[in-house]
């Protein structure tokens, strides 16, 4: 007899996991609806159905409203962030999909999904089931027994994990899974607002339960504890016992175990086709229905905010109703180059006007990678693959270096860096389909598989590594046979070639082709050169600074303990809250709930900084600790052992505004406004004997506001060369410029920059620490003084509502589908973006133009100095001796010439022995 296998899915845990897994490459319908959560959940469901083949299955949801735990504790889950609007929209679709699969949706008013799962799992034992609870949440581990296991779905390439009794006990360091409740009772759960025993983490909790078996036994034997731990437990007995009640999953929910309903049923093909059609899940439709998915009309896509098409056009009913074929498997004639045919193939490629390319590399990090091979598409239907050998690499280089053949690919910056590793280059002309798509849909995924599916209606083959294969640790794909590698690489090269005319047409229609050809594509080469050049770090200086900061941390901790008059862990938010509000009574309004802990976020502490000297010390402690972990101790770990430099990666297709971002390290977040942060910049140094040069745009965003708004008073102040913040203060406060006080200038400066981000009276009052009425008057005075700025803000919001996007001065678009959201918070965020995106996006365009101009001029004039870093509105260079004057002149000229408006740009420059001195 077949073993009955029951899968119980924790719906919301899987939905949130799917949503956040695709946070940086979300999926959207052509109507602008974010389908990431739905797509991820359905993929997970499909995977478990196919791989595990359960005989019975149910999906459990949390019901709307409160549960019995809220009756026990009113603030249960009070700290949870609001559910994202995209998930709220997704849930009804997910429930419809589950039902279309013939799977029951189970929820019970007054109980959480965990309780429903616990009850069904308990009932399944007596019915002979082998039960698997599918969830990433640790709480459910308390239910594990010989017939119930936890099934943790795979994540980020990792396989699914099944945890039985032994595995749960090993993970938590306990003897029995039921003791997970005791672990949670001690360590608490911030997400659910279960405080536990403040100051006791998971490791300590595990040790205590391993020794005492339960929290009840621990409480009865606190005389065996010592020091601070003894004090913590004894002073939190009620909290611990109450937390255990909250953490215990109820296994007696009043529901029936409907074995027939939970058994597998056929998929409702019509319903699946209808729902997947609306969501534009074409590849999923093919996977679920197979051949039955073919030759059916695609339903009208699901509506979303603004009813925008994939490219932002108004979507007509006729266009929406037009039948679209489901994606089919990509087919491409694939030839593998041999000694006999390689010359003919390469010559044929070099005779083309345009080819598609896809480079296969030996490592995921460009600076460590070599060329393993290259696929070249002669047409969308024919491609060849050259495996890199000592002889064939020269043929590959011939293709890359061609200045007559346009090379169309994806993520070409990576390929350029790899080519530079062998002192070669991928020469212009080239075309990157990810960048082209980024201009059209900046917040969508730009992966080649996704682009091919959406625009070509093709499913590209992917690398399938057999479970028994021994993977290449640098690039698992290289463990495959050359035929398999060639098939995937050639399909990608062919898809790139086929995508180019699709994107070119749309870019021309949307009048954005110039952004691609004049700004973004030329920048690829600039960024590749910067990444490959890298920057030196003074490790000795950082080591000394680390030692000094560590000593300061110890000194601050001692000072805090002295000020508190009690021993406590300054790094523990829970203990800090107890000291500030229970012992020192700094804020009488900071009421402590029955089992909650005080909020000691930076925002909270900043408001209290004037009430007691310990608050400032705690803030200082946290800033130093973050500085140490994020930069001082982390930067040396990022040094490439072969070059001795840090090679940051610039991301050209990530931010919605058009700004560049960087990773490993994130240069954009290096602090500069305090002495501690500036010491980090001091550690960035030029090559031996060279100088460090820095150039920074002066108040570029305010200058852009003046140019966009054409506000007469703002333009006049800039053209007069006045201190813009002092001039603003003089106008707002009706003072002569020379009579403006420092405090008035400070307020005007905050208002100037706050307006760019659509700051409210509440926000301004918080930032300036002034009454809201005064902040309101300040804002009213600002807009009375600068009516053109108010007009620009209103017009930007109206444009967003009308078109679904706003544009920079250069025509770059920021899509704003939430501008008509019914949720006031979500809509307000979109309105602030409507104001800020044209400003920030224009600044991004300008710095990119400047980088291109400087790079080309350096090349024309034979300048050997190198551009190293781009951070916000600042460029940094390694300057060869004797080129100081030339670099200073060229950089300043080209940065200021990058944009011509009524209010000119100004670049401030500096030279020094390191980044700090230069800046």
Model-derived regions, located:
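C-terminal or mid-to-C-terminal helical accessory/interaction module adjacent to the motor/catalytic core
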Residues: 175-202, 237, 256, 260-265, ...
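Short alpha-helix plus adjacent loop in nuclease-associated cores
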Residues: 75-89, 145-174, 230-232, 384-385, ...
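Conserved RNase H-like, two-metal-ion catalytic cores of nucleic-acid enzymes
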Residues: 6-7, 17-56, 74-75, 79-86, ...
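Conserved catalytic core of nucleic-acid polymerases
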Residues: 475-478, 532, 640-643, 647-648, ...
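C-terminal polymerase-core module
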Residues: 551, 555-558, 562-616, 784-836, ...
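Extended two-metal-dependent nuclease catalytic cores across DNA- and RNA-processing enzymes
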Residues: 2-4, 24-28, 78-255, 453
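Conserved "right-hand" nucleotidyltransferase catalytic core of DNA-directed polymerases
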Residues: 236-387, 443, 451, 471-672, ...
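Extended, highly charged clamp/arch subdomains and adjacent linkers
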Residues: 1-61, 65-77, 89-96, 237, ...
């Amino acid at each position: 007899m077949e073993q009955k296998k029951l899968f119980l899915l924790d719906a919301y845990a899987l939905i949130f996991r799917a949503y956040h897994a695709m946070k940086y490459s979300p999926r959207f319908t052509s109507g602008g609806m974010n389908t990431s959560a739905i797509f991820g959940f359905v993929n997970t469901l499909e995977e478990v159905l196919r791989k595990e083949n359960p005989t019975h299955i149910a999906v459990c949801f949390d019901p709307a409203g409160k549960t019995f735990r809220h009756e026990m504790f009113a603030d249960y889950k009070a700290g949870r962030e609001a559910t994202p609007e995209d998930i709220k929209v997704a849930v009804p679709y997910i429930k419809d999909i589950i039902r279309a699969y013939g799977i029951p949706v189970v929820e019970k008013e007054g109980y959480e999904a965990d309780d429903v799962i616990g009850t069904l799992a308990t009932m399944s034992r007596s019915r002979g089931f082998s039960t698997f609870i599918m969830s990433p949440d640790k709480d459910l581990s308390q239910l594990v027994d010989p017939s119930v296991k936890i099934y943790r779905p795979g994540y980020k390439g990792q396989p699914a994990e099944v945890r039985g009794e032994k595995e749960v006990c090993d993970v938590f360091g306990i003897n029995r899974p039921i003791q997970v409740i005791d672990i949670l009772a001690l360590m608490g759960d911030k997400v659910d607002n279960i405080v536990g025993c403040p100051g006791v983490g998971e490791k300590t909790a595990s040790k205590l339960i391993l020794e005492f078996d339960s929290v009840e036994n621990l409480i009865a034997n606190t005389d065996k504890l010592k020091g601070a731990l003894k004090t913590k437990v004894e002073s939190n007995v009620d909290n611990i016992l109450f937390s255990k009640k909250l953490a215990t999953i109820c296994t007696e929910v009043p529901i029936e175990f409907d074995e027939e309903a939970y058994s597998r049923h056929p998929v409702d093909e019509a319903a699946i086709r209808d729902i997947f059609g609306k969501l534009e899940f074409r590849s999923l439709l093919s996977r679920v229905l197979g051949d039955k998915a073919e030759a059916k009309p695609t339903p009208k896509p699901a509506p979303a905010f603004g009813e925008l098409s994939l490219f932002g056009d108004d979507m007509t009913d006729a266009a929406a109703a037009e039948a679209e074929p489901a994606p089919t498997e990509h087919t491409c004639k694939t030839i593998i180059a041999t000694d006999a045919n390689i010359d003919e193939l390469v010559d044929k490629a070099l005779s083309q006007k345009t080819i598609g390319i896809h480079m296969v590399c030996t490592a995921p990090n460009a600076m460590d990678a070599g060329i393993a091979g290259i696929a070249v598409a002669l047409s969308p239907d024919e491609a060849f693959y050259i495996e890199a050998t000592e002889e064939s690499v020269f043929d590959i280089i011939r293709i890359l270096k061609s200045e007559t053949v346009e090379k169309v690919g994806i993520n070409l910056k990576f390929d350029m860096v790899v080519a530079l590793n062998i002192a070669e280059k991928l020469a212009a002309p080239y075309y990157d389909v990810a960048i082209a798509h980024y201009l059209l849909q900046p917040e969508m995924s730009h992966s080649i598989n996704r682009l091919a599916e959406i625009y070509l209606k093709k499913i590209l083959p992917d690398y399938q590594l057999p479970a028994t294969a021994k993977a290449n640790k640098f690039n698992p794909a290289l463990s495959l046979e050359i035929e398999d590698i060639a098939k995937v690489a050639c399909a990608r090269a062919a898809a790139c070639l086929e995508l180019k005319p699709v994107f070119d047409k749309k870019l021309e229609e949307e009048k954005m082709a110039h952004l691609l050809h004049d700004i973004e594509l030329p920048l690829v080469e600039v960024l590749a050169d910067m990444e490959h050049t890298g920057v030196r770090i003074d490790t000795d200086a950082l080591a000394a600074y680390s030692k000094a900061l560590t000593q300061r941390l110890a000194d601050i901790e001692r000072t805090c303990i002295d000020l508190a008059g009690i021993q406590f862990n300054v790094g523990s938010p829970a203990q800090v809250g107890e000291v500030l509000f229970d012992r020192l009574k700094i804020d009488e309004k900071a009421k402590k709930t029955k089992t909650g802990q005080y909020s000691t976020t930076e925002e909270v502490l900043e408001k209290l900084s004037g009430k007691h000297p310990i608050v400032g010390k705690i803030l200082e402690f946290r800033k130093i600790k973050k500085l140490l972990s994020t930069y001082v101790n982390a930067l040396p770990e990022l040094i490439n052992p072969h070059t001795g430099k840090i090679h940051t990666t610039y991301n050209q297709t990530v931010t919605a505004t058009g700004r560049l971002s960087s990773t490993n390290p994130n240069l954009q977040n290096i602090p500069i406004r305090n002495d501690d942060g500036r010491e980090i910049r001091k550690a960035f140094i030029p090559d031996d004997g060279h100088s460090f040069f820095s150039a920074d745009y002066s108040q570029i965003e305010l200058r852009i506001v003046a140019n966009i708004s054409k506000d007469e008073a703002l333009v006049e102040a800039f053209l007069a060369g006045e201190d813009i913040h002092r001039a603003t203060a003089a106008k707002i406060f009706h003072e002569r410029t020379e009579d403006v006080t420092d405090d008035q200038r400070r307020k005007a400066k905050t208002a100037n920059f706050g307006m760019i981000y659509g700051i409210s009276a509440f926000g301004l009052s918080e930032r300036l620490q002034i009454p809201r009425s005064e902040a309101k008057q300040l804002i009213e005075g600002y807009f009375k003084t600068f009516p053109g700025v108010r007009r620009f803000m209103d017009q930007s919001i109206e444009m967003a509502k009308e078109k679904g996007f706003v544009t920079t001065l250069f025509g770059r678009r920021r899509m704003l589908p939430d501008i008509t959201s019914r949720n006031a918070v979500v809509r307000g965020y979109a309105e602030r973006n409507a104001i800020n995106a044209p400003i920030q996006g224009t600044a991004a365009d300008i710095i990119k133009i400047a980088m291109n101009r400087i790079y080309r001029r350096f090349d024309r004039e034979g300048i050997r100095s190198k551009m190293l870093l781009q951070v916000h509105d600042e460029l940094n260079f390694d300057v060869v001796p004797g080129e100081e004057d030339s670099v200073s002149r060229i950089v300043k000229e080209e940065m200021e010439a990058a944009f011509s408006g009524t209010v000119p740009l100004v670049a401030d420059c500096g030279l020094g022995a390191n980044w700090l001195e230069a800046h």
